[in-house]
A protein has these predicted regions:
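Short, structured patches in soluble enzyme cores that scaffold and shape functional sites
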Residues: 2-6, 33-38
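Alpha/beta catalytic cores of nucleotide-metabolism and tRNA/nucleoside-modifying enzymes
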Residues: 8-10, 14-22, 27-31, 55-74, ...
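A short alpha-helix capping/helix-coil boundary motif
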Residues: 1, 39-41, 62-63
Length: 166
């Protein structure tokens, strides 16, 4: 498996990316997670690189079209169920990053919509399981903040979310 951006600095050409993927394939990679944004290695901070270079989903779609034998997973700026549905028409999978970190409960909503699951856990049930996990980990010496800092978004957009974050 390899994860890469579609280009860097002044290089965002289909042939360059396709050749790079072929080299990785020849080395044994079968799954490629393609972030649909090039990386600006000079002039932008890592934080700026999260938003400033434009997303180019079509290049990822074209890579899949030219390489149907490879598993191509698209990544970059994806946060809504309709976006996921659309990308799945052209790619084998979707990787969601920041939006899941900001609102982890959206994974339950995505699972319900995409996979038609039933009996999905409520936020409260997720919080209860989290507390059980936290209790076990604290007994093993894990610091509370090492876990809790990744869960502040569990009640994202809900009444009382500020209390959860505290």
């Amino acid at each position: 498996t390899a994860k890469t951006r579609i280009g860097f600095d002044d290089t965002e050409e289909f042939d360059y990316l396709n050749n790079f993927i072929h080299k990785m394939r020849d080395a044994g990679a079968k799954t490629f997670i393609l972030h649909a944004r090039k990386a600006m290695l000079t002039g932008l901070s890592p934080k700026q690189n999260l938003n400033i270079p434009k997303l180019n989903y079509k290049m990822v779609y074209e890579i899949k079209k030219k390489n149907p034998e490879l598993e191509i997973i698209i990544n970059g700026g994806i946060s809504k169920i309709d976006e996921i549905d659309n990308h799945l028409k052209f790619c084998d999978g979707v990787m969601i990053g920041r939006s899941i970190y900001q609102n982890p409960y959206s994974l339950v909503e995505i699972e319900k919509e995409i996979f038609k699951t039933k009996d999905n856990p409520t936020r409260e049930q997720v919080a209860e399981k989290l507390l059980e996990y936290l209790d076990r980990e604290v007994k093993l010496g894990t610091k509370v903040n090492h876990i809790m800092r990744h869960t502040v978004g569990l009640y994202h957009g809900q009444v009382g979310s500020k209390e959860w974050k505290r």
